Every structure is written in structure tokens, then in C-alpha cells.
């Protein structure tokens, strides 16, 4: 399993970018689920 992380294709830019975007989207979704009013301010 750990040899997988040292392979060349896993460290390529599309794979790293996809993992980064998925993690960022997941963090935003979970943040908005627990604290729904901090991301969108309808009064502004």
C-alpha cells in the first residue's frame, strides 16, 4: 500500500489536483453542514 504512494503516476499533477479538489470540497460540505450560516450571508 505504501509503495503505491511513491509511484510516479500517483505524484503527477492531475492526480494531486483531483485529490486536493475532492478534499477541499469535502471540507466545505462538512463545514456547511455543521455551521450553515457562516459561508453565505444573505444580508450583505
UniProtKB/Swiss-Prot annotation:
The name this protein goes by in its record: Photosystem I reaction center subunit IX
Membrane topology: Single-pass membrane protein
GO biological process: photosynthesis
Listed transmembrane segments: 9-29
InterPro entries: PSI_PsaJ, PSI_PsaJ_sf
Reported function: May help in the organization of the PsaE and PsaF subunits.
UniProtKB keywords: Membrane, Photosynthesis, Photosystem I, Thylakoid, Transmembrane, Transmembrane helix
Compartments where found: Cellular thylakoid membrane
Pfam families, alphabetized: PSI_PsaJ
Gene Ontology CC annotations of this record: photosystem I; plasma membrane-derived thylakoid membrane
Major localization class: membrane
Species this protein is from: Prochlorococcus marinus (strain MIT 9211)
Entry's family note: Belongs to the PsaJ family.
